[in-house]
Amino acid sequence: MGKLLQLALHPVEMKAALKLKFCRTPLFSIYDQSTSPYLLHCFELLNLTSRSFAAVIRELHPELRNCVTLFYLILRALDTIEDDMSIEHDLKIDLLRHFHEKLLLTKWSFDGNAPDVKDRAVLTDFESILIEFHKLKPEYQEVIKEITEKMGNGMADYILDENYNLNGLQTVHDYDVYCHYVAGLVGDGLTRLIVIAKFANESLYSNEQLYESMGLFLQKTNIIRDYNEDLVDGRSFWPKEIWSQYAPQLKDFMKPENEQLGLDCINHLVLNALSHVIDVLTYLAGIHEQSTFQFCAIPQVMAIATLALVFNNREVLHGNVKIRKGTTCYLILKSRTLRGCVEIFDYYLRDIKSKLAVQDPNFLKLNIQISKIEQFMEEMYQDKLPPNVKPNETPIFLKVKERSRYDDELVPTQQEEEYKFNMVLSIILSVLLGFYYIYTLHRA
C-alpha cells in the first residue's frame, strides 16, 4: 500500500512504472530452443542472488548474456566464501587464493557454508556453473579466470591484513585500492568482455581510468549509503583520512550532537565520489550495442540518484536510505540513451547543489567539481551554441556524435511505447467514464 501511495504522489514515476511493466518489450529473451537446463538453473541462481541485477543481465545480447551471468555467479561464490565467518580461517584463505583453479575442473561444489548463509546455493550447485562455463569461448573463459584469481587473492590479502582488520581503511588511497578489488576489477573484466564481443571500440579498454571509475563510482556510493548498516555489523569502509577531520571516532556521527559533523563528512565523501563522473560519462559514450549500453548505464544513473539522496541527509547516519521504486522505473526508461543519462546526471547534480550550504567546509570544492562536470556535459553535445558558430570537435564531442546514431535508432521504440501507453490509458478512462455515466443515469 505504501508503494502504491508513493506512485500516486509522483505521477511521472507512476507512468514510468506502468510503461516498464506493460509497454516495454525486452531487447532479448533468455528462453529459446538452445537454452540448456543447466543454463536455466544458472539464471535461477542469478535471480536468487540479485533480482535487480538479474533483470538487467537477462536482457543482454546473447553473445554476452551467458558469460556475464556466469562471471557474476562466480564472483558471488567468492563473496559467499569471504563473508561466511563459519568457514575455518585457513580453509577460507586457501579457497579464495585457489578458487580460479576450480574453473579448470568439470565437477566441483562446496557445501561448507553455514546453513543460514543467503547465497550458499551458488556453491552447492556450482557444477551447473562449471558445465556452462566450459561452453564459453576460450577468450571469455580466460578473462573470467584472471579476474577471479585477482579478486580471490585480494580478498585473502585483506583477511590477513591485521592493520586493516583492527583500524579499517586509513587513507583515501587505501579506499581506492579497496574499491578496486571489490568493484574496479569487475569493471576491468566486463570491459574486456564487451570489447571482445565487439560491442565497443577497443580504445575503451586502453584507458584503465575509465573502467576503474565505473566500478569505483558504484562502490563508493554504496559505502556512503551503508554507513549505519556497516557499523551495526561491526564493519567500516569510510577512510579515516576523511572522517577523522570531523570526529575522533567513526561511530561518533551517530550521536545527536555530532550530526552536523556527520553531514559534513558525508558531503566530503560525495565530493570524492563525484571525481569519477566525467570518466563514467566518457565510458558510456564509447559503447555501441544497445543492451550492453543499458547494462552499463542503469547502475550508474542509480548511483548518481543515490548520491543526491544521501547528500546532506541525516537519515544516512541513523538508518538505511533508498531511492523510490518509481524513481528506479523512471531512471531505467530514461537511461536507454546517452542523452537521457546526461540529463539524469545534470538533474541530480543540480539537486546536490541546491542542498549545499555555504557553511559546508567543502562548499567551494563541491561547486568547482560540479561545474567541471557540467562544462564537460556541455562539451559532449554543444547544442546551445549561437547561430553560425561551429562546435569544437573535441574527442568527447566526436565520440558522442557517433553514439548518437545508436540513440536515434531507439526513438521509434520509445514512440511506440508512448503510443501503447496512451491507448491503454484512453481505453481505461473511457471505461471508467462509461461506468460513471451509467451510474449517474441509475441515480437519476
UniProtKB/Swiss-Prot annotation:
Secreted listed as a keyword: no
Induction or repression: Expression is increased in mutants with phenotypes consistent with known sterol biosynthetic mutations (ERG3, ERG7, ERG24). Heme mutants increase ERG9 expression while anaerobic conditions decrease expression. Additionally, the heme activator protein transcription factors HAP1 and HAP2/3/4, the yeast activator protein transcription factor yAP-1, and the phospholipid transcription factor complex INO2/4 regulate ERG9 expression.
Main location: endoplasmic reticulum
Subcellular location: Endoplasmic reticulum membrane; Microsome
Top-level EC class as recorded in UniProt: transferase
Catalyzed reactions per annotation: 2 (2E,6E)-farnesyl diphosphate + NADPH + H(+) = squalene + 2 diphosphate + NADP(+); 2 (2E,6E)-farnesyl diphosphate + NADH + H(+) = squalene + 2 diphosphate + NAD(+)
EC number: 2.5.1.21
UniProt topology in membrane: Single-pass membrane protein
Biological-process GO terms, alphabetical: ergosterol biosynthetic process; farnesyl diphosphate metabolic process; isoprenoid biosynthetic process
Keywords: Endoplasmic reticulum, Isoprene biosynthesis, Lipid biosynthesis, Lipid metabolism, Magnesium, Membrane, Microsome, Multifunctional enzyme, NADP, Steroid biosynthesis, Steroid metabolism, Sterol biosynthesis, Sterol metabolism, Transferase, Transmembrane, Transmembrane helix
Cofactors (names): Mg(2+)
PROSITE patterns membership: SQUALEN_PHYTOEN_SYN_1 (PS01044), SQUALEN_PHYTOEN_SYN_2 (PS01045)
InterPro entries, per the entry: Isoprenoid_synthase_dom_sf, Squ/phyt_synthse, Squal_synth-like, Squalene/phytoene_synthase_CS, Trans_IPPS_euk-type, Trans_IPPS_HH
Pfam families: SQS_PSY
Other comment: Present with 10800 molecules/cell in log phase SD medium.
Family: Belongs to the phytoene/squalene synthase family.
Function: Squalene synthase; part of the third module of ergosterol biosynthesis pathway that includes the late steps of the pathway. ERG9 produces squalene from 2 farnesyl pyrophosphate moieties. The third module or late pathway involves the ergosterol synthesis itself through consecutive reactions that mainly occur in the endoplasmic reticulum (ER) membrane. Firstly, the squalene synthase ERG9 catalyzes the condensation of 2 farnesyl pyrophosphate moieties to form squalene, which is the precursor of all steroids.
Protein name: Squalene synthase ERG9
Originating species: Saccharomyces cerevisiae (strain ATCC 204508 / S288c) (Baker's yeast)
